[in-house]
A protein has these predicted regions:
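Conserved alpha/beta-hydrolase catalytic His-Asp/Glu region
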Residues: 209-264
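Catalytic histidine-centered segment of alpha/beta-hydrolase-like enzymes
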Residues: 322-330
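Active-site loop/oxyanion-hole signature of alpha/beta-hydrolase fold enzymes
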Residues: 73-76, 119-157, 335
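Flexible "cap/lid" loop of the alpha/beta hydrolase fold
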Residues: 171, 178-212
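Conserved HGGG/HGGXW glycine-rich cap/lid loop of the alpha/beta-hydrolase fold
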Residues: 76, 81-124
Length: 345
């Protein structure tokens, strides 16, 4: 297996050797979050260009950050971001349609050596020709990555699709996982359709004349927050093709029309194919499990009750956030991840 590295041009050599203590009040978290996410930085040709301003807004040193890639056993490539020095202690898995950069602010706040992985079909990782993005399939890739890139069991954190992928991994390779944190997803939640505005966003064309066109479309549908936040999200989740057209990096956008046509919005009980095996995987996990429910996300109070009924030893925490907790409450999420001494961070 081959590993390729591309080192970020920005880092602080005076990185603190001590963990960041995030035990202040939630109002402070909200203030820091506002500063970190509302910094208006110019889009350039570097995926790392946003990090210095984000770290400055948080008041933390910017660790070394690099993009790494692994040639998988079947010839595909799995890509990731590595934050910090030393062996990774934490691995972060994003949700459908996102990429490793969704964790940037959380990773900076946590200040620990970690990996943020682009799942297959997302970011800089290869698309699958069979379009199989079931959690167990995705977990096989992450297993190869952790075998290659880590030397100790991981605090494995997965949001949405990444959470179910983490459960599948923890069930089959308990030696790789010290603790599993599942963010705003349970196997009983069907997120395949998503909000109506999200369906409208992906139901249109798959390529565009410019990133600016996508920014305008996203903002017209209420996505992305401020213009600066929307520009950052679009820049980090798109690429410019050889013909000059802009397309989403993730395969899901290109599969959206077919998936949306197959979904019956009138059948609320229709199970998502991605989640059918999730309960079995979670029941097989031997590591401690925490469910993080977003108060304004996809997991309801009843879903959380069912989660604890099936997994009585699991812990459930609630954060004031929307579904993408790592983007709307990243500092509070980092505080939660750092709050238990048993996690060793």
């Amino acid at each position: 297996m081959q590993i390729a590295k591309a080192t970020a041009p920005y880092y602080d050599k005076k990185r603190s050797k001590k963990p960041l203590i995030l035990s202040k009040s939630l109002p402070h978290f909200r203030t820091v979050l506002t500063r970190a996410q509302n910094v208006d930085v110019a889009i350039d040709n570097s995926e790392f260009s946003y990090l210095p301003a984000q770290a400055e807004a948080l008041g933390v040193p910017l660790p070394p950050v690099e993009r790494i890639a692994l040639r998988l056993s079947d010839g595909r490539t799995l890509s990731a971001l590595r934050f910090g020095t030393g062996s990774p202690e934490v691995t972060l898995l994003h949700g459908a349609g996102l990429n490793a950069h969704t964790w940037d602010t959380t990773a900076l706040a946590l200040q620990r050596p970690l990996l943020a992985i682009d799942l297959a079909g997302h970011g800089d990782s290869s698309w699958r020709e069979d379009a199989d993005y079931a959690p167990r399939t995705l977990a096989d890739d992450v297993v190869e990555a952790l075998d290659a890139w880590t030397t100790q069991p991981q605090l494995l954190v997965g949001q949405s699709l990444g959470g179910l992928t983490g459960a599948a991994l923890a069930a089959t390779r308990p030696d790789l996982v010290s603790e599993l944190v599942v963010v705003d997803i349970t196997p009983g939640v069907d997120v395949s359709a998503g909000p109506a505005a999200l369906r409208a966003f992906y139901a249109g064309p798959t390529d565009f004349a410019s990133r600016g066109e996508l920014v305008e479309k996203a903002m017209s549908l209420g996505f992305g927050g401020t213009r600066a936040e929307t520009e950052r999200g679009v820049f980090l989740n798109t690429r410019v093709r050889a013909d000059g057209r802009v397309e989403w990096k993730h395969h899901f956008a290109h599969l959206a029309a077919q998936a949306l046509a197959a979904h019956d919005p009138g059948d609320s009980a229709a199970p998502s194919a991605l989640h059918e095996t999730g309960w079995d995987d979670l029941a097989s996990v031997t590591a401690p499990i925490t469910l993080v429910r977003a108060a304004r996300g996809f997991v309801s109070e009843n879903d959380a009750v069912e989660f604890q009924r099936r997994l009585p030893d699991a812990h459930v925490a609630v954060l004031d956030a929307t579904h993408n907790v790592q983007e709307t409450a990243p500092v509070a999420l980092a505080a939660l991840l750092a709050s238990t001494p048993a996690r060793g961070i």
